[in-house]
Each structure stands twice: as C-alpha cells, then as structure tokens.
Amino acid sequence: MIDPVNNFKIPEDWIARTGLPREELETKVASGMLVVLSDGSILKRGYTTGTTASAAAKAAVLSLKKTVDNVSVPTPVGLRARLEVSEASQGRAVVKKIQNDHESDITRGLDFVGEAREAEGIRVLGGKGIGIVRRDGLQVPKGQPAINPKPMEQIKAAVQEAVEELSLRGAEVTISIPDGERIGKETLNSRIGVEGGISVLGSTGFVEPWNDHLGETRGDLIRCTDKVVLTTGRIGMRYSHMLFPDYTIVMIGSRISEGLDYASGDVVICGLPGLVLKWGNPDMLKDGEYATVVEMLEKDPEHPRLKEAFEMAIEKGKGARIVVIDRDGSVLMDSKNES
C-alpha cells in the first residue's frame, strides 16, 4: 500500500496496527487524505490554500450557469480533491478550507471566495485578503498577488475544467479571502516581504499533518537504512531521487537536527538554501539586509554569510554530506567538493 501524496510504501506491520479492514484503509489512503503512522494511528491531511482556491474558482465559474454544491478539482500530485461549496450563484462561490490534524495551520476554516465572469482565455486575479509581494527573491514577482506558481497552475486547470463543462469562451476569476488580511498578520509574510494578506501555497495540494508522531514515523524510516538522504521539502525530494538513486529519501522539513539524531551510516542532507543554510546559521539574516536567503543568493552570491552558513552546516552535520540545490535541481554547494 503506497501513500500517493509522498510515494511512501506503508509497511505491512503499520497497516495491521490500524485495526481497519484492508480494503477500507486502502480506499482512504488512496484519496490522499490519511497518513498511517508506525503505531497504527491515523492522521488526517487537509487541503492547501491552493486547492481551496481552485475549488472556489471552479465553483464560481460553474455557478454562472448551474447549481453547485460541491466540486472536484485536480491537485499537483495527480489526485482529485472534492470540496463542499458553501454558497454559489451568479458567478460567485464560497468554499471553506477544511479542518486537518496540522495543529498550527491557522488557515483552517477560512472562507475562500471566487468571483467569475466569462472572458477570452483563462485569467486568475488576486483579490482582498491575498497578500502582495513587495520584495524580490520570492517565487512570485514583486508587485503580484502572492499566489505561488504551482497553485496558480492548479487554479487555472480547475477553471479550464469549468469553462469546458459550460462551453464558455474562457473566464476571468478573482480569488479573495475575507479574513486573509487579519490572518496574514499572524504569519511570517511581513518578514519575507508579503503584505496585506496570506499567500496561496501548496506543492502537492494537500496539507501534511506534521507533528511529533510524524517525527517518529520518519525516525523509523531513517533508522531502517544505512544510506539515507534527509531532504527539506518536495523539490529536494524530487531531485534527491535523481542525485542519489540508491539512497532512501526522507522528507523532514526543517527538522534536520532531529533527523540526524535518527541517522547512521552514509547520510546526506539535501535541500534548498533557505532551510539548509538557515539551519547552519539561524542568524544569517539577522541584520535585515536581506529578507530571504534566496534574495541574498540572487543579489550577492559571494556574500560571506552564505559560505559561513554552509561551513556551519557542515560542522552541525557531524560527518553528513551537505548538498544545497537550486529549484531547477542544479547543485549550488556540496561539502564533498570542499577541500
């Protein structure tokens, strides 16, 4: 049985410990909404802001010509997500971001509003409650709504489905989050240069229910291998499979030190600079000259703090190989090449 969101093969003893009929468990796991832990307990994933926005956008378009109470939208990992629609009429729809077991997901329960009109082609706009990018170095250009590229693709794909279903020429959809500006103040957005609301994010379409129990699950996986790559996210995971094909790849997010505690043998830490270098030196951005590590890399690639943070990461790695990659998979830094 394989978790379709992270491609993790769930061990048979974990499956047995759930106590659920195999067919029932397989159906639920296949939906992407459940995570099975090593002790047999089950946690619920949620849908990202990107998936919720996609549902609101699609429902808004469909409501131009029909009644809508739920919608199915594509996700970046290839699964379908079905969400309830709170309101939908005359080109306006509301979808609530569902609950999940991620204890610190402050966007749970937020209303996402889509407002649509027929137009030429597909166009998605950011409305009230979606932050605006005010600094360079992020995935979204300065001055644009903070809708990351992957969820933007997802939203446009969902709108395209609705356009085809209704045989429209195209559609323009504005996404807004009425409570987004207030919630945005509780996030790190202002520190990285996003103002006025939250960001629309999500590389998989699903919110992982990260907590201490999942730390144990990953700990079990790390312990079981003597050749492991600890990676910080899905981009790192994708390219780690290519760079280290005979290693076990484990996604640990920002918990690099915790992952190292479980690891032995041949260990690699591989990921984007924002997490790996800041793990090496958490204070590398303290003077406020740059908002993000990416901005520092782009504007001053020879900045001494980059090398300093990398050297500190090597020291903290206690013999692990440290590999820092770019978003296209190119290797920026590799401790194997250090003299």
UniProtKB/Swiss-Prot annotation:
Source domain of life: Archaea
Keyword S-adenosyl-L-methionine applies: yes
Listed GO biological process terms: anaerobic cobalamin biosynthetic process; methylation
Record flagged with keyword Transcription: no
Reactions performed catalytically: Co-precorrin-5B + S-adenosyl-L-methionine = Co-precorrin-6A + S-adenosyl-L-homocysteine
Any matching Pfam family: CbiD
Record-listed E.C. numbers: 2.1.1.195
InterPro entries reported for this sequence: CbiD, CbiD_sf
Swiss-Prot/TrEMBL keywords: Cobalamin biosynthesis, Methyltransferase, S-adenosyl-L-methionine, Transferase
Single GO MF descriptor: cobalt-precorrin-5B C1-methyltransferase activity
Secretion signal span: none
Top enzyme class: transferase
Pathway the protein takes part in: Cofactor biosynthesis; adenosylcobalamin biosynthesis; cob(II)yrinate a,c-diamide from sirohydrochlorin (anaerobic route): step 6/10
Family recorded in the similarity comment: Belongs to the CbiD family.
Protein name, as recorded: Cobalt-precorrin-5B C(1)-methyltransferase
